[in-house]
Amino acid sequence: HKAIRRQRQMCIRDSPSGSGKTTLMNIVGCLDQATSGRLILDGQDISKCSDNQMSDIRLQKIGFVFQNFQLLARQSAMENVCLPLTYAGVPKKERRERAAIALERVGLGDRMSFKPTQLSGGQKQRVAIARAIVNHPKILLADEPTGALDSHSGEQVMELFQSLNDEGVSILMITHDAEIASMAQRTVEIRDGMMKSKEVAET
């Protein structure tokens, strides 16, 4: 079985199309169930969870960051970040307070009322990260989070990920960028249905 260790950055890179990257992310993200084996997340055996339990785990313990941001175009940055809290049944006043803190955390305190069309690519990704962390997840899943960004914006996102990791958030990320992958504590390649892992020495 696989256990997701706390406070780790693991990067999946250079794996060919169809190798299972997305399937692995979906299983870790409690979107799909594995057909065999076990997944232990924060001490809980996910393979034994019902659909409702998996939904609760997604809301409470997992944040998702996508390459193309997946923001609602007609909603402000504040409203986009509030969405997970709305699904979790958090009262409106608390939702806005927590969303404001998350947006401040990613350096967008002055862009809360802006809609996605008024933001740069890097700013959109930071809104997406704020949305992912507003529920204080144990693990952050990021699928090519810098793939649609210029190098400067990509560096800013990775600095933010490093800061979150230092605070105890585990990060599982897919990337084809060797430089981005080198920042992780562990890299994994998936080939022919097998995972090949490499630990990165800490400095």
PLM region descriptions:
Residues 136:
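Conserved catalytic motifs of ABC-family nucleotide-binding domains
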Residues 37-45, 151:
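Conserved ABC transporter NBD signature motif
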Residues 44-45, 86, 93-110:
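Conserved ABC ATPase "signature" region
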Residues 115-125:
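Conserved ABC ATPase signature
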Residues 75-83:
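Short coil-to-helix segment of the ABC ATPase nucleotide-binding domain corresponding to the Q-loop/switch region
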Residues 29:
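Helix-to-loop junction immediately C-terminal to a conserved catalytic motif
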Residues 1-8, 12:
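Single conserved hydrophobic/aromatic residue that forms the stacking wall/gate
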